Amino acid sequence: MNSIEISTEIAKIKYWHHHFDFGDGIETKQGKEGKFCRKFQQWILSGIPEDLTDKTVLDIGAWDGFYSFSAEKRGAKRVLATDSFIWQQQELYGLDHNFWRDFGAGKQGFELARKIYNSQVEDYNIDVLELDKDKIGTFDIVLFLGVLYHMKYPLFALEKVRSVTKELLVLETHISLFFSLFPQPLMQFYPSNELSKDVTNWTGANIALVKSWLLTAGFRKAELVKWRKDRAIFHAWC
Ligand SMILES: C[S@@+](CC[C@H](N)C(=O)[O-])C[C@H]1O[C@@H](n2cnc3c(N)ncnc32)[C@H](O)[C@@H]1O
């Protein structure tokens, strides 16, 4: 694809979750929001190991796939991007009251970015709670970024994540700032749209609870590696 074709295809996609800079001045977003996404993505990226040479990487809840493509660029020999909720939204566009339809959210961004990068990243539509090593195998490094607080059953979800992790889990999540003042494992529950007006957000764990969940789910060691406002990055080792 030449630059004009790339720009045309990018413009056809109504909503990009990730900011991509494809070079030659071609970006997926402009202005303030683009700048925020870029900064946030760089912050998350800085919590992922720089060298992924010869590693297998699973990106759970990949959406547009920015972190999957980044893992490939960092030398990973195999990258599998999985998602379900947002990748299925296009199929649900016909339904009434589909909040995401108006956004235009779906899998289009992932597919176009993969084409532009000529990437070998694989994709698989699977719910977190269906993750199973017999279906997808196990991976040296697993990325679970921005997904945990969308889980109604967070500990069960982490057990599923643990079952497909061989070496290291990189977890990024929303945390409750208030409850993180306490050393005990505590959680805020969002029964409706209290967090960011999004009804798919359920939990705001504190730092201690995320670590406890990781150990309970079967990881040998769990550490907080970065913390900014109400977002935190943890590493957990098998
Ligand atoms: C806030 S986005 C995070 C996207 C990306 N990982 C990032 O950090 O930018 C949450 C993602 O989790 C996915 N997701 C939510 N619930 C899921 C589920 N039950 N199974 C699989 N993916 C899910 C959504 O479709 C969406 O892509």
PLM feature spans:
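Conserved SAM-binding loop of SAM-dependent methyltransferases across substrates and taxa
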Residues: 64-76
